[in-house]
Amino acid sequence: MSASSNSTAFHEPADGAVETHNGAAFFDLDRTLLAGASGEVFADAMRLAGLSSKPFPGEKLLFGLFNTIGETLPSMALARQAVTLAKGHSQAAVSAAADQVADRLVAMVQPFADAAFEMHRTAGRPIVLATTTPYDLVKPFADRLGLDDVVATRYRVREDGNYDG
């Protein structure tokens, strides 16, 4: 679910002032923050961005398997191939496609999330989405939820605004 610090950390800067930190709350995406996995939604986003034109053979089966048992070595290998698919494609197009599907992900958020977010905010903890999903895909979703930060896979982008693969 979430990991957070229950203790307050103290740091004494060089000027003698004392800072306090209440930690942070980290939430994973698939089958934690979301009721299922995000793969099917992001596959649709990739098609919207022009990274693929149609579902690959066995796609529905793979997404169903991931929703049921989680990450496996084959599914991780498939995810690694996404960077190859992204090579030469526009970061802006991927971000725009992710923005178009973000509300579908918001609809999948677990019922506990609002109360958990409020508890952490009240305690002064920033809320962070932590996922291996590419940043450009999850950032619009995190923004919709009002999260404070995102820790995610980042693809390099060339000067022309396209992924370098």
Where are these regions (language model features)?
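C-terminal cap/substrate-recognition subdomain and adjoining C-terminal extension
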Residues: 1-16, 22, 96-97, 103-165
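Short, compositionally biased "basic patch" segments
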Residues: 61-91, 145, 149-155
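Metal-dependent phosphoesterase signature
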Residues: 77-111
